[in-house]
From Swiss-Prot:
BP GO terms, sorted: microtubule-dependent intracellular transport of viral material towards nucleus; symbiont entry into host cell; viral penetration into host nucleus
Keywords: Disulfide bond, Host nucleus, Host-virus interaction, Repeat, Secreted, Signal, Viral immunoevasion
Protein name: External core antigen
Family assignment from sequence similarity: Belongs to the orthohepadnavirus precore antigen family.
GO molecular function: DNA binding; RNA binding; structural molecule activity
Site (Cleavage): 188-189
GO cellular component: extracellular region; host cell; host cell cytoplasm; host cell nucleus; T=4 icosahedral viral capsid
Subcellular location: Secreted; Host nucleus
Biased composition (Basic residues): 188-210
Region named 3 X 8 AA repeats of S-P-R-R-R-R-S-Q: 189-211
Post-translational modification (record): Phosphorylated. Cleaved by host furin.
Gene behind the chain: C
Length: 217
């Protein structure tokens, strides 16, 4: 249903249903829906990342297929991240079908170029962001991705003279967290190995009992 309204809006068909389509899609676009809220993130945090930060859609799709093909094509529910990846892939598949339909039905080359560029710059970018976010959460962990986004936002909003020259890297964050956990565990181990003073006191009465028969003789 929404694809029909999208076709009317993009093709700019001069018919009475055009205004109705704009109203229908306006209700949908006007809702404050942020699909990253349930994962502890937001659209605003992801928008701080530059456009060239996100890989190409073909690379993201190949990565998702190579790593999680069984989980994505299976019937069982694995995690909310797998479900989000499924929805992103289905959405992009429908958009590509829409572009192919408009390319074959719109005669103006200029209009087709404008539509394709608009789809790639808007919805294509959202699909890239969604696939990158959920694939990163499955690879590095959701908490690690949250820490990376917050640290990147702090880094990029800090003036250049007062920040490190290089931006935070997502792949280095899990190593630091492992080192911190190991250090905390290592500091507790010496306390457990120290002998308690009660054991030394318990040995003294035994020595006195062993000496008592020799004293009687």
């Amino acid at each position: 249903m929404y694809l029909f309204h999208l076709c009317l809006v993009f093709a700019c068909v001069p018919c009475p249903t055009f205004q109705a389509s704009k109203l229908c899609l306006g209700w949908l676009w006007g809702m404050d829906i942020d699909p990253y809220k349930e994962f502890g993130s937001s659209y605003q945090l992801l928008n701080f990342l530059p456009l060239d930060f996100f890989p190409d859609l073909n690379a993201l799709v190949d990565t998702a297929t190579a790593l999680y093909e069984e989980e994505l094509t299976g019937r069982e529910h694995c995690s909310p991240h797998h479900t989000a990846i499924r929805q992103a892939l289905v959405c992009w598949d429908e958009l590509t079908k829409l572009i192919a339909w408009m390319s074959s039905n719109i005669t103006s080359e200029q209009v087709r170029t404008i539509i394709v560029n608009h789809v790639n710059d808007t919805w294509g970018l959202k699909v890239r962001q969604s696939l990158w976010f959920h694939l990163s959460c499955l690879t590095f962990g959701q908490h690690t991705v949250q820490e990376f986004l917050v640290s990147f936002v702090v880094w990029i909003r800090t003036p250049a003279p007062y920040r490190p020259p290089n931006a935070p890297i997502l792949s280095t964050l899990p190593e630091h967290t492992v080192i911190r956990r190991g250090g905390a565990r290592a500091s507790r181990s010496p306390r457990r190995r120290t002998p308690s003073p009660r054991r030394r006191r318990s040995q003294s009465p035994r020595r006195r009992r062993s000496q008592s028969p020799s004293a009687n003789c």
